[in-house]
Amino acid sequence: MVFLQSPQASATRSRKMLRPPFSASNHRRAGISTFLFLVLVGLAWAGPPKAPADKTKYVVAIGDVHGDFDDFVGILQRAGLIDAQHHWTGEQTTLVQVGDLLDRGPKPREVMDLMISLEKEAPKAGGRVVALLGNHEMMNIMGDLRYVTAENYAAYADGNSAERQRSAYQEYVKWRTSHAHLLAELPQPMELTEAEWMARHPVGFVEQREAFSPRGSYGKWLREHSAVAKIGDEIFLHGGIHPNLAHLKLDTINSHIRDEIKAFDSAKQDLLDQKVILPFFTLQEISAAVQAELTAERKSLVPLDQQKQARLVGFLGYGDWLSARVDGPLWFRGYDQWSEEEGAAQIGKVLESYNAKRIVVGHTVQKGGRMRPRFGNRVFLIDTGMLSSYYPGGRASALEIQDDAKFTAEYMDQQMVLVEPAGPSVRSGAPE
């Protein structure tokens, strides 16, 4: 059974009902004298101090945003987490965003700016914002820019961007001339004409690359974040944990991905120092240059620098890194693709490994723009295609979790209770 609530039953009111109520008498006052007597007695002997009321646990999880700033703001407001000025109003709520703030949509920069602001504001009210890395965050860190649009680049442009673009092209021409012997080793040539280069590196491109560098405003911010988090009985991440990786502790997964980012940054800096690449090279351009360098080294009559060769080979193996593997936590789609029978057993093993009851993931857009609980409500798939201009039928949504027991899908026009606690048992609301 799915429990529906009207649009007027706002999430703000629902959340406030969950907070500790103020004490109020359900009886009429017997009279002024009785009231004053009770006050005086209270002043004379207050008794032992009362323990503070337990704060009702409330978590809101949001799936992939993909630069859809307007709908992201809308669902945050619908969930009662921000006001019209985009300031935090969620009080003690924990907001979890499971990655893919970026790419495809028109305003990824505004989305990140809002998350950065809320991360600072929420703790002042007793709340918390947890921003997790998705595969698209990793892609931007490493320079895999296949889903970055010209509009996205333009958001980083300023009055000097055209000049920077021209200077970058001139640097590229010089690099291409000095590395002609390497480029000859490539099976496919890197772009040769000015028009091709400019089309692939539009105005704002150079600034975007700097912003995502280790020193850049967004690059530094993203590098501070984790890939997976456990809050209460729930595990949150972008893609999922493959059963073959369930032997890794959650902290190990996070540290492993951070180490891979550091390894990438270090390798890129080495390549820059050796003048193998230029600072604004994309991942594909870096890979091509490294492959050409490695091929030339092997053909050279000069004895190979074994350490250098190992670094080059190691870099080209990034596809096997935990952060890039198809069965890794940022890319895995098994929770969506498994049959119910296959997944039920697999999920049990994963949850047991982490002493958790449920996993919440994004990454794979759900049909009809609806969240989907699976495997006996032990997995919640919450990517509902917020960027509807890219995902037809998609919509903004938020998964609201009360006390690790009640799970509600919040949409802009309605609420759907997916799991409703009913005494000692839990009543399921969404059929598989």
Descriptions of predicted regions:
Residues 30-31, 387:
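A generic signature of intrinsically disordered, low-complexity regions enriched in glycine/proline
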Residues 1-27:
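N-terminal secretory signal peptides that target proteins for export/translocation
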Residues 33-42:
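Bacterial N-terminal signal peptides
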Residues 2-3, 31, 125:
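Short intrinsically disordered, low-complexity coil segments enriched in acidic
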Residues 13, 22, 42-432:
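Feature recognizes metal-dependent phosphohydrolase scaffolds
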